[in-house]
Amino acid sequence: DQAAGVAAIIEIDNIFSESEVISK
């Protein structure tokens, strides 16, 4: 399902964003 793929990408992007904030 395309919607599920988009949701997964957003979730991964959020995890990377949180990791960047923590590393800074």
Curated annotation (Swiss-Prot):
- State the name under which the record lists this protein: Unknown protein 6
Q: Which organism is it from?
A: Lonomia obliqua
